[in-house]
Swiss-Prot record:
Species of origin: Xanthomonas oryzae pv. oryzae (strain KACC10331 / KXO85)
InterPro entries the UniProt entry points to: ClpS, ClpS_core, Ribosomal_bL12_C/ClpS-like
Gene: clpS
Chain's role: Involved in the modulation of the specificity of the ClpAP-mediated ATP-dependent protein degradation.
Family: Belongs to the ClpS family.
Protein name: ATP-dependent Clp protease adapter protein ClpS
Record field: compositional bias (Basic and acidic residues): 1-13
GO biological process, one term: protein catabolic process
Region (Disordered): 1-20
Gene3D superfamilies attached to this UniProt entry: 3.30.1390.10
Assembly with partners or alone: Binds to the N-terminal domain of the chaperone ClpA.
Length: 106
């Protein structure tokens, strides 16, 4: 009688394929920093244009930045955060405002 080779070394143990644990990529907060020169309406425009916020959301964040010195505009992957920081800073300089946008790991 032929031996069943598929079960020849089966000792009742089940081998489960291991799945590598992959941590999610780090997220980054994009921040606006308050200054004494940039008009509030310009900050609202930046928040609407670059972060797709509505007027109410943009106004709330602008007031938070104004009263607390800085505020989170959104949380993104590193590449997206870097792009938004560069876009906002370039837009601010083009419009001759000192508004500063930065990022930090969330």
């Amino acid at each position: 009688m032929p031996r069943n080779t598929s079960h020849e070394h089966d000792h009742g143990l089940m081998v489960e394929a291991s799945k590598p644990e992959v941590a999610p990529p780090p997220r980054y907060q994009v921040l606006l920093l308050n200054d004494d020169y940039t008009p509030m309406d310009f900050v609202v425009t930046v928040l609407e244009q670059f972060f797709n916020l509505n007027l109410e959301q943009a106004t709330q964040i602008m007031l938070h930045v104004h009263t607390r010195g800085r505020g989170v505009c959104g949380v993104y992957s590193r590449e997206v955060a870097e792009s938004k920081v560069a876009q906002v800073n370039e837009f601010s300089r083009m419009n001759q405002h000192p508004l500063l946008c930065t990022m930090e790991q969330a």
